[in-house]
A protein has these predicted regions:
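Membrane-interface segments of envelope glycosyltransferases acting on lipid-linked substrates or membrane lipids
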Residues: 1-206
Length: 206
């Protein structure tokens, strides 16, 4: 319930003495805009992706959440882009450059020990690949905005010349069935492995 959630958040802000409201995503940005109106606190949102593309393939969500997010982004005081390109995109759409900042996604370079070795991990996710295979991989939600279909098409082209190539796709989403069908259509369903949602990312990236 939107009104109940807003009332609860307003009470939290007043009781706990917060100084700033930070949000990201359509629903979070909408709530932050409403909270700013109710509390007068400054707001900042982190923009991770092109908000006009976030709901590709979902017309109803694009009409509702996409529109809400577009309006809310204009109401919030400050915006953080996760890359220089994202900041430039927002500036090109009329957002005030004086209220835009780039803060890059953090990377942890601490050495990590994977739970499984290469061969064991491949077996656990159903990928058929021996020591002579070169495995490319991606971990992402299977959503139209990620355009995994282009990756599969590119892989199919490369596989014709390099038959030892394999593709490991980790992630879940509404495009799963379509992407599996595409791999079959291109004749690489045995070489493309869909691992689904994974929690052991250390073994995946290793």
């Amino acid at each position: 319930n939107l009104l109940a959630a807003l009332k609860k958040l307003v009470a939290m802000v007043k009781t706990d003495g917060y100084d700033i409201i930070h949000s990201h995503g359509a629903r979070g940005n909408m709530m932050a805009a409403l909270l700013a109106h109710k509390t007068g606190l400054p707001t900042v949102t982190t923009v991770h992706s092109d908000y006009r593309l976030d709901y590709l393939g979902r017309p109803l969500s694009r009409l509702t959440y996409g529109t809400i997010n577009t309006l809310a982004l204009r109401k919030l005081k400050y915006r953080i882009g996760v890359s220089d390109a994202m900041v430039d995109l927002l500036i090109s759409r009329g957002f005030d450059p004086e209220r835009l900042f780039a803060i890059y996604n953090g990377l942890d370079f601490t050495p990590r020990t994977p739970a499984m070795g290469r061969d064991d991990y491949f077996r656990s996710v159903g990928l058929e690949a021996d020591d002579t295979c070169v495995v490319a991989g991606i971990a992402a939600r299977l959503n139209p905005v990620k355009d995994i279909a282009t990756l599969i098409r590119g892989f199919a082209l490369a596989h014709k010349d390099f038959p030892k190539l394999r593709l490991l796709i980790a992630g879940d989403g509404e495009e799963m069935d379509n992407l599996k069908a595409l791999a079959a259509e291109l004749g690489v369903s045995k070489e493309v492995c869909f691992a689904g949602w994974i929690s052991d990312t250390d073994s995946f990236y290793h």
